[in-house]
């Protein structure tokens, strides 16, 4: 089992932009000295649900601050970016970091972003798949020469080529059943979202396993990642209230058609929020539902920085005891 961190970088009435960015930097430098495997940064546009619109830029900065931990994007939205530019940046970061860069990518979840970035909404899935094929060709071979419905240009070389053989490690966010099935056919590991229910994640995991088996994918080589929010306190109600305040605006924006209070309680119950027993029980259940080999943790809902560090230390001690 491997453990890492992810950063949402939400801003709200208690956390301003500068504080969110500074904490991400401080925690990254801190965990680089510990036993965590990787750090992934979330992409977001046009709202307070994240201040990072360019996760590859942030990844480059954080890679420069660190020595051993792997760092990359959590959900780089390839549908709304030019695939060649993504491939060039990924290869460059892979070279500069000598193989420590990770490319976590995603389809476009927010429908308002497609028209804003002048992308055809009616062909979103086809565009997503074509963008991936171009990026994958560039990362694995050093060249790309697409002849598709959306991109068509002569063969070009990636400069530089990737440092890592076959390119940096890639993950795709499990944003829909269609994306999960597509990823399973190609053997691309998933990142399960913290705000999806355990039931949804379980269905995605089962569907992935079934499709991957049909396509001859070696599931032993697939290292799915599970995102979990952490807010640990011996005062369980305090942890839950902090988490409610942290995620409320996000739920309203991203789950507008669901019952707000029900969704809020579902997320708090199924993530590691509360006292030690509640945190560990919720994490174990979520892991069982997904069958993942990797856990990505966010401690950002804990408003006190010292409490965040203490919680990180507890996880790090458990990694040393049980997973090394």
UniProtKB/Swiss-Prot annotation:
Gene3D superfamilies (UniProt xref): Luciferase-like domain
Enzyme Commission identifier(s): 1.14.14.3
Class of this enzyme: oxidoreductase
GO CC term, one of those recorded: cytosol
Presence of the UniProt keyword Amino-acid biosynthesis in the record: no
Any GO molecular function: alkanal monooxygenase (FMN-linked) activity
Domain of life assignment: Bacteria
Keyword Oxidoreductase attached: yes
CDD domains: Alkanal_monooxygenase
Keyword annotations from UniProtKB, A to Z: Flavoprotein, FMN, Luminescence, Monooxygenase, Oxidoreductase, Photoprotein
Name of a matching Pfam family: Bac_luciferase
GO biological process terms on file: bioluminescence
Classification via InterPro entries: Alkanal_monooxygenase, Bact_Lucif_Oxidored, Bacterial_luciferase_CS, Luciferase-like_dom, Luciferase-like_sf, Luciferase_bac/NFP
Catalytic activity, reaction form: a long-chain fatty aldehyde + FMNH2 + O2 = a long-chain fatty acid + hnu + FMN + H2O + 2 H(+)
Coiled-coil residues: none
Function noted in UniProt: Light-emitting reaction in luminous bacteria. The specific role of the beta subunit is unknown, but it is absolutely required for bioluminescence activity.
Entry's family note: Belongs to the bacterial luciferase oxidoreductase family.
Quaternary state and interactors: Heterodimer of an alpha and a beta chain.
Name the UniProt record assigns to this protein: Alkanal monooxygenase beta chain
């Amino acid at each position: 089992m491997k453990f890492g961190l992810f950063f949402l970088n939400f801003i709200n009435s208690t956390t301003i932009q500068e504080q969110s960015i500074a904490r991400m930097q401080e925690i990254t430098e801190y965990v680089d000295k510990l036993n965590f495997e990787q750090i992934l940064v979330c992409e977001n546009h046009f709202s307070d649900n994240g201040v990072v619109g360019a996760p590859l830029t942030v990844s480059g900065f954080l890679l420069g601050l660190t020595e051993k931990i792997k760092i990359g994007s959590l959900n780089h939205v390839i549908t709304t970016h030019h695939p060649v530019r993504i491939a060039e940046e990924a290869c460059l970061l892979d070279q500069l970091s000598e193989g420590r860069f990770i490319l976590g990518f995603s389809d476009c979840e927010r429908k308002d972003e497609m028209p804003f970035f002048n992308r055809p909404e009616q062909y979103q899935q086809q565009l997503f798949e074509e963008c991936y094929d171009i990026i994958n060709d560039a990362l694995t071979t050093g060249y790309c020469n697409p002849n598709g419905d959306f991109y068509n240009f002569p063969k070009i070389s990636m400069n530089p080529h990737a440092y890592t053989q076959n390119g940096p490690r890639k993950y795709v966010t499990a944003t829909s059943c269609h994306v999960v099935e597509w990823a399973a056919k190609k053997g691309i590991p998933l990142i399960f979202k913290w705000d999806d229910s355990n039931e949804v994640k379980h269905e995605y995991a089962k569907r992935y396993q079934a499709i991957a088996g049909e396509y001859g994918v070696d599931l032993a080589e697939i290292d799915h990642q599970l995102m979990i929010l952490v807010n640990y306190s011996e005062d369980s109600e305090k942890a839950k209230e902090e988490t409610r305040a942290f995620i409320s605006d996000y739920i309203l924006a991203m789950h507008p058609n669901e019952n707000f209070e029900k969704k809020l309680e579902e997320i708090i119950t199924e993530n590691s929020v509360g006292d030690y027993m509640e945190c560990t029980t919720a994490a174990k259940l979520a892991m069982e539902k997904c069958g993942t080999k990797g856990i990505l943790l966010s401690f950002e809902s804990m408003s006190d920085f010292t409490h965040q560090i203490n919680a990180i230390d507890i996880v790090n001690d458990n990694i040393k005891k049980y997973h090394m």
